[in-house]
């Protein structure tokens, strides 16, 4: 489970290395370092401002998905101004292209960082979506 930059870490665990989790639950995750689609601050903190295009490519996790990547559910808001929603769609599309179980839930509002906030308008819906998805992948 990961939120925002923590979503990048959780997705890294799913795409890099030989020991992988059984599944990922990713909330508005940072996925890509591609110019114009990335959350700049996350990659400055991770790799510095002097990073190379090769480093950006290596940490753009949509390109690291393989048939061995575990299933994932992605939850985000369409109006997120911090982490562009395209981050989630890139990862979702990569999972689907490899035949991996994936589900994506885009809420019309909420911005960024709503996590488990009680005031998030769609809290009950995301909780139900995650529970239903977990049941489905464990059938």
Regions found by a protein language model. Name each.
Residues 30, 78-80, 108:
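Residue-level signal for short, function-critical loop segments
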Residues 8, 76, 112:
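Histidine-centered active-site/metal-ligand motif
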């Amino acid at each position: 489970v990961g939120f925002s930059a923590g979503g990048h870490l959780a997705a890294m665990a799913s795409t890099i290395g030989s020991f992988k989790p059984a599944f990922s639950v990713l909330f508005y995750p940072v996925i890509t370092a591609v110019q114009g689609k990335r959350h700049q601050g996350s990659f400055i903190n991770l790799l510095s401002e002097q990073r190379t295009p090769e480093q950006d490519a290596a940490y753009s996790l949509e390109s690291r998905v393989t048939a061995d990547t575990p299933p994932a559910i992605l939850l985000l808001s369409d109006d997120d101004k911090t982490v562009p929603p395209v981050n989630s769609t890139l990862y979702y599309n990569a999972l689907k292209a490899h035949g991996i179980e994936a589900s994506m839930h885009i809420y019309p509002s909420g911005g960024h960082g709503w996590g488990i906030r009680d005031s998030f308008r769609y809290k009950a819906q995301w909780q139900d979506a995650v529970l239903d998805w977990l049941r489905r992948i464990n059938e």
